[in-house]
Amino acid sequence: MTAIGAQAHKLLGLKRPHRSFFESFIRTLIIVCTALAVVLSSVSICDGHWLLVEDHLFGLWYFCTIGNHSEPHCLRDLSQAHMPGLAVGMGLARSVAAMAVVAAIFGLEMLIVSQVCEDVRSRRKWAIGSYLLLVAFILSSGGLLTFIILLKNQINLLGFTLMFWCEFTASFLFFLNAASGLHINSLTQPWDPPAGTLAYRKRGYDGTSLI
């Protein structure tokens, strides 16, 4: 084998150092919990029925009146609930909550890509995914707070439905996974290819791309 061929073989065989089982387990757990949070939030928003007060069911999409022996009568036009600002406020709440799901999906994608395609940029991709989850937490919390503020006079702790608690749990998981992702990224050491390798030359001594 020629010297050039041997060097090329060495460069192709260069791999990232094997990470510990604990680190791999934690990163996998973060990805799984993030996927669970995305599912919970999506189902909660699509259903949208978050608060039951006596014979009234308040949601992101509908306002329903429940009779004693009749089917729920639901109105898509929330202005007919005779509550000032409810229609506009609910529109804002569901928009913010939906944006949280979108941010979380992109964050989840970055987390998965950083683990499947491991290279010198994996840590950066993981950090971006974690920050997107933090954005998802802020947006999701904003949607929950908007809903609570709009219906503060009707709120009863026992009146919150399962779908509301699903969204609350998803919001908490967004924060927990974002914080955990950033923390584990700060604990692990970045992978720098040995000097003289092709990957090192591409990055340059200051970390910038030369090719």
From Swiss-Prot:
Segments traversing the membrane: 25-45, 96-116, 131-151, 155-175
Main location: membrane
GO cellular component: monoatomic ion channel complex
GO molecular function list: calcium channel activity; voltage-gated monoatomic ion channel activity
Record Pfam families: TMEM37 (PF15108)
Compartments, record wording: Membrane
Subunit structure, as described in the record: The L-type calcium channel is composed of five subunits: alpha-1, alpha-2/delta, beta and gamma.
Name the record gives this protein: Voltage-dependent calcium channel gamma-like subunit
